[in-house]
Amino acid sequence: MQKSYSLQELATQIGATVRGNADVVVENIAPLDKAQSNQLTFISNVKFRALLKDSKAGILVVSEEDVEHCSPESNLLIVKDPYVAYAILAQYMDSTPKAAQGIAKSAVIFDGVLLGENVSIGANAVIEEGVVLGDNVIIGANCFVGKNTKIGSGTQLWANVTVYHNVEIGANCLIQSGTVIGSDGFGYANDRGRWIKIPQVGQVIIGNNVEIGANTCIDRGALDATIIEDNVIIDNLCQIAHNVHIGTGTAVAGGVIMAGSLTVGRYCLIGGASVINGHMEICDKVTITGMGMVMRPITEPGVYSSGIPLQTNKEWRKTAALTLGIDGINKRLKALEKKIS
């Protein structure tokens, strides 16, 4: 049966000021331009204010500045930040199917595993010896958890996650399907053309409240640990190489590649498809815009960009030609400066 939520109930969740019928109910959340009378919507960008007046939504989440753009008949939740309010309400109204409770008959649990209370382990999952799973941990179907790994309370691994041996994952983490944690780092020595593999004997240590997207790889350290601190969020298809250290509260968008022994500070924002060199540091509160190529340390907080924004092919060819000719132009300018002086 579809659950419904009243205006007043939702206002309590986000500390909102109410305008309209406190008893009106909605069932779910929809985009501003599509929401119907049984749905809640929100506005987080002023360029969409023109849509407010004719919105059919049962409830609108708006800021004080948005109110005058709404119909007098609209039921409003008035808040300081509608987008944050939306995030809180989306959690409260979340209808994502829950994982099956209990331990599946086909799960393989080795001797010496310590299970907390209310642990759930899905079909065909393998939990090797020495593993410690905290209270309310959820291990999805077909997951593998290697020897002596520790997973903190309330953490969930969706189906088909692989966690190698000696990994530590904190409490209340969420790891999406296909992610691999603790695989070997890319460590080799070259002996006259022959690659000699260096065993990767370090760990991966992940803090609390960390979320990791689907099909991301986090390599174990060569000697010391690869470290992901508390409250880090990492999107899909990222490569985190051995001995990377990511600071508290940093967000990493999809497709990012971080080379080995990189240190990323706290509260950084790393744009999608960025590539960051290893063996260097990025300070706290740095934003790297999408497709950034970072080859040197960053020592000052701020926003950094690289790359060429999209152009027509004709414009891009001109830009490329000019770029290739910069050295010659520079030499001619220096020659002119020398003559003038």
UniProtKB/Swiss-Prot annotation:
GO biological process terms on file: lipid A biosynthetic process
GO cellular component terms, semicolon-separated: membrane
Biochemical pathway: Bacterial outer membrane biogenesis; LPS lipid A biosynthesis
Keyword Acyltransferase recorded: yes
SUPFAM superfamilies: Trimeric LpxA-like enzymes
Enzyme class: transferase
Superkingdom of the source species: Bacteria
Single GO MF descriptor: N-acyltransferase activity
Active site as annotated: H242 (proton acceptor)
UniProt keyword Phosphoprotein, yes or no: no
Keywords (A to Z) from UniProt: Acyltransferase, Lipid A biosynthesis, Lipid biosynthesis, Lipid metabolism, Repeat, Transferase
Record note on quaternary structure: Homotrimer.
Name the UniProt record assigns to this protein: UDP-3-O-acylglucosamine N-acyltransferase
Species for this entry: Haemophilus influenzae (strain 86-028NP)
